[in-house]
């Protein structure tokens, strides 16, 4: 089961009136924590039982753990509060670093703040 997380400066992610944009992240591109990259195309390839399908998520940031090179975790923007999914909450650390760089916090769907 995957958990949804949001990167926000607001007290509540679902009431964020001024969400972080990918352009803000781009301004700090040289400072991004290791493993993060900006992907302006945002086209994902997903393996299914029927072959490989593509999905366009628009410009995004992805994290690739050096110990898990076949797996990317995408932070989606799409005009909303940046969000990403993780199956294992113990893997939040790089996203907490990204949030700190943006003077923000990570919140789950229930509003619990992670630091």
Where are these regions (language model features)?
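Acidic (Asp/Glu-rich) sequence patches and key acidic residues
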Residues: 1-115
């Amino acid at each position: 089961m995957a958990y949804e997380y949001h990167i926000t400066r607001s007290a509540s992610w679902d009431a964020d009136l001024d969400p972080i944009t990918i352009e803000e992240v781009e301004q700090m591109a040289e400072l991004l924590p290791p493993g993060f990259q900006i992907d302006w195309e945002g086209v994902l390839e997903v393996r299914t039982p029927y072959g490989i399908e593509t999905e366009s998520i628009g410009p995004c940031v992805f994290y690739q753990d050096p110990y898990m090179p076949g797996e990317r975790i995408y932070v989606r923007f799409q005009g909303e509060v940046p969000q990403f999914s993780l199956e294992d909450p113990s893997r939040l650390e790089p996203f907490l670093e990204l949030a700190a760089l943006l003077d923000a916090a990570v919140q789950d769907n229930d509003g619990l703040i992670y630091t």
